[in-house]
Curated annotation (Swiss-Prot):
This is Paladin. One of its GO terms (cellular component) is cytosol. A lipid is attached at G2 (N-myristoyl glycine). Gene3D superfamilies: Protein tyrosine phosphatase superfamily. InterPro entries: Prot-tyrosine_phosphatase-like, PTP, Tyr_Pase_cat. It comes from Mus musculus. It is found in: Cytoplasm, Cytosol.
Amino acid sequence: MGTTASTAQQTVSAGTSLEGLQGGSSSSMDSQHSLGGVQSFRATSLHNSKAKSIIPNKVAPVVITYNCKEEFQIHDELLKAHYRMGRLSDATPEHYLVQGRYFLVRDITEKMDILGTLKSCGAPNFRQVRGGLPVFGMGQPSLLGFRRVLQKLQTDGLKECIIFCVREEPVVFLRAEEDFVSYTPRDKESLHENLRDPSPGVKAENLELAIQKEIHDFAQLRDNVYHVYHNTEDLRGEPHTVAIRGEDGVCVTEEVFKRPLLLQPTYRYHHLPLPEQGPPLEAQFDAFVSVLRETPSLLPLRDNHGPLPALLFSCQSGVGRTNLGMVLGTLVMFHHSRTTSQLEAASPLAKPLPMEQFQVIQGFICKVPQGKKMVEEVDRAISACAELHDLKEEVLKNQRRLESFRPESRGQECGSQQAVQQRALWSLELYFYLLLFNYYLHEQYPLAFALSFSRWLCTHPELYRLLVELNSVGPLVPGDLIAKGSLEADDLVSLDALSTVREMDVANFRRVPRMPIYGTAQPSAKALGNILAYLSDAKRKLRQVVWIFLREEVVLECDGHTHSLWPPGPALAPEHLVALEAQLKAHLSAPVPNTKSPTAPRFQKCLTTQEVFSQHQGACLGLTYCRIPVPDFCAPREEDFDRLLEALRAALTKDPGTGFVFSCLSGQGRTTTAMVVAVLACWHIGGCPEVGEEELVSVPDAKFTKGEFQVVMKVVQLLPDGHHVKKEVDAALDIVSETMTPMHYHLREIIISTYRQAKATKEAQEAQRLQLRSLQYLERYIYLILFNAYLRLEKTSSWQRPFSTWMREVATKAGIYEILNQLGFPELESIEEQPLSRLRYRWQEQSRDPEPCDVGDFL
């Protein structure tokens, strides 16, 4: 091997071999450890028994056997995990830690057993849903306890049963006399919390096997015992020693649940990890549905007249996640029995809870056929499972806490309120996903689950759009937005990349060459007059001007300066924005309370956006003002494209020479996107110019500069004449960008530029923000291509079918939303573990991630 080693005999004992192999004492060991890998002491012992010399080496230990005929290095990935010692306090003994940092703590206590079923049934909080449906829940049983649960189910005449363990944390079972009881690894800093999300891509089952092997190895180092804890609040008498003898001294979850089922083929076990907070992932719903699909007695088959199978859900305490599983199972049983009358009769005292006060629930009822009925069905299912935990009441309780939040100190305000708001959001999001699952059952249960839950959701993108409204946790009260918001003066000078403030009194004013399409930043009343005079002068002679205002924020002009409400709040319809601006104006015009001169208003003159334009309509008779709020950074919504095209077509039908002006805060992102939409629409209405040959681009990664991202080309391949459709969009982007080169690259370049910035930055929060931006820009580019395809394909029918309808009826079936649900840069990195690649998280961030802003005057 080329490795020089001494042949002098070196004694290596079991107690010291680990330090020798690891290259130092435990105190000097590297703090990093592999969750998936565990050091194999038995393998090391085997080598020790044969070894004449073991020489530490930077690559791996070099082992020379006694007969000097064999020399080898141990290239075992498992040896990279360090054995570490630790203790909970100075009064407790030191012992080995699993995975290098965790203590094993018994996770079931008598306090958890609220229903007192541990002794009588074998598991804590064992119960059945009200109404007699065969849906059960329980806490974590021991091995013998689980056998007693099975006996009870069989005694009750249940011939078929599906057992779901819904725990997502690793659990190991250690011998206690003739039984095996559960323990979970916990961090010293959070001894009351189970280990969650150990590492991306690491499954709890694999982690359990690694810990199982570790405990075997630790026991061999410490006289066949290992130290565990029963009470981390009172360390007197802790830790306890558990004898570990042989391979069967430690069991994992699958062994405890599957071994008793070996001789009962009609009883099946599945691991279905569910989160402790918030809703399950689509993949977790898919896993649940796949089990249902494999259960003929649960499917709507013609010859299926047998008894229903039992569904048994188990988590640690049998409350939170178990309750969620029971609600899911109850909804499935509803659809199998086609009636909920038995449950209505079972809970006559369950008072209806006002869930419709939440904007996202209102949106669901409005968008979904029989939406109100589906909400009522979910409420009945929750009530049937509410013996220990009521999910509806949890939503309302969290909302009440949020409304009555009073921090103990100013310094505590931000963190505490954020924690309360996060809990409120999680509970509402969970309730919303139960509604989605019930809607899924309505459509897919009669079809025996032809589509998985995740694929079905991609056929209903309007439901993903509702996620944006989830951030409005409480009822939408305009007065609350005003009371809790602040008024920010718009910064219109530093944004002036095109240096047009000096000439036009407004930032980034520009025109599309050879077309009456203009873009600008937020104008003041004075700047608006200058622009209208410019457009109607002797050179341009525009008789009709349509001004399309794109801001989603509440905007007022106060004493000659534009201001906006911060934070901007949830997305509102144009009419609601107008009403809220009027309400804010009235609020600002009222006397300031608690002042010596109560009649003094905050501003001398205050105008809404509508009033600013109305003042100029007298001087410019051809001016038409249109409010089409569009989200910043990301792609316009499908309905936004509808409104833009409708405004453009109506104006051009009236006067083909109409000029269009688009404006947002900076005159950049939203304005540029709307200008491209206008260019494409005008081309298709008046005739598209010939798109020239593709120019050669001599720069590194030229395909990105040309917009040839892998996901974009995937969309292009689905569209008729897709490459030409993309070329037209690229031509529109180029023509709009001709006069704005100093502002930045055009959209195709800014996608990859922002992606590289995200990879280069070292600050985690900034990296995530830039990653989101790059994906939003990429999605915006794809939507422009889809909109252009719509313009081409629907031209013969004069676009009678709106773009939103076309996306739902055509693009959805083509799989466009499934592509958008895996958005990213697979040619540069894996997108498997990136939540923002999925619609669920990316669209929800539209209202959760406003750009940072300095604090202004509180209202």
